[in-house]
Design a protein with these regions (language model features):
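Selective transmembrane helix interface/packing segments
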Residues: 1-288
């Protein structure tokens, strides 16, 4: 069920991006060639109706709620939604819980996607001549792309904390999450979720670093994607001050950054040596 939910979230995301892109593409003053398919013309975009994509998105979320209700009831399998630091279990036999699960699942998926875009925007904030991939990224961020870096860095933590405060109230009302003993505990949990939200940057960071290493030693062409990977990887290394960590043709900087990224998301420990995520989980478990 988790794989099915991921595939449907991906389909819903594509519908959302097409709906957004038809409104944003005419504003792009640069050359054409920035779309999900690779090219899109402003004149064509302005004439294309947007409502089918939004209607398809809403319909998909509603239909999959009914599908989860039917399939989950027959399999007697509970649906689990990873809410960052904690996982919430939903009963598929209760239809209203499946509607809530479907909406929250896509909301978290969409939020993580935009936080990935925000990360790449921060890393490449000094790039003055962006290629097609970076232009499209900046186009989707819209107003936030023009905000200062310090505000972009604060945004994931603030949004994660606020999202938990809102979701926790709803989950407690539906008895899907234990009621908190005090507002202080609720606020501390929100802060921990806010901090844990930054760990959603681990997958894109690790992916870019791995692809950067591959592209550094194997020629993979001159496509906009590989250009974006190369620029992003190089900017990451420079911003951490590791640009000179080389031995002849061997670049150790990506490996060092990968080790750091792995440590941040590690939930384990060796003696008194705790991974970054483990510290947040320990703090969460101590709250009542």
């Amino acid at each position: 069920m988790a794989l099915l939910d991921f595939i449907l979230n991906l389909a819903a995301l594509l519908l959302w991006l097409n709906w957004r892109l038809l409104a944003l593409a005419p504003r792009e003053s640069g050359p054409s060639g920035i779309s999900l398919a690779g090219t899109i013309k402003s004149t064509a975009a302005s004439r294309s109706p947007r409502w089918p994509y939004l209607s398809g998105l809403v319909g998909l979320l509603l239909v999959r709620s009914l599908a989860y209700h039917t399939i989950g009831s027959n399999l007697a399998e509970r649906m689990t939604l990873p809410f960052g630091i904690v996982s919430i279990s939903f009963n598929p036999r209760i239809l209203k819980q499946m509607f809530l699960f479907s909406g929250l699942s896509f909301g978290l998926f969409l939020g993580a996607f935009y936080l990935w875009l925000l990360l790449f925007s921060i890393v490449n904030t000094r790039v003055t001549e962006p290629n097609a991939c970076l232009r499209l990224l900046r186009l989707h961020l819209g107003w936030w792309e023009r905000r200062p870096v310090w505000l972009k860095l604060l945004l994931p933590g603030v949004l994660g904390a606020l999202a938990w405060l809102i979701a926790a109230s709803l989950l407690e009302a539906l008895a899907l999450f234990p009621a908190q003993s005090s507002n202080t505990a609720r606020g501390l949990r929100a802060c921990l979720v806010g901090l844990y939200t930054y760990l959603c940057w681990v997958p894109p960071l690790a992916s870019v670093l791995v692809l950067y290493m591959v592209n550094s030693y194997v020629y993979l062409g001159e496509s906009a994607f590989w250009g974006f990977v190369q620029v992003t990887g190089r900017n990451l290394i420079e911003q951490f001050g590791l640009a000179k960590l080389r031995l002849r043709r061997l670049d150790f900087a990506p490996l060092l950054l990968l080790a750091l990224v792995w440590f941040l998301q590690w939930r384990g420990h060796l003696g008194w040596f705790f991974g970054g995520a483990r510290l947040l989980v320990e703090g969460w478990n101590r709250l009542r």
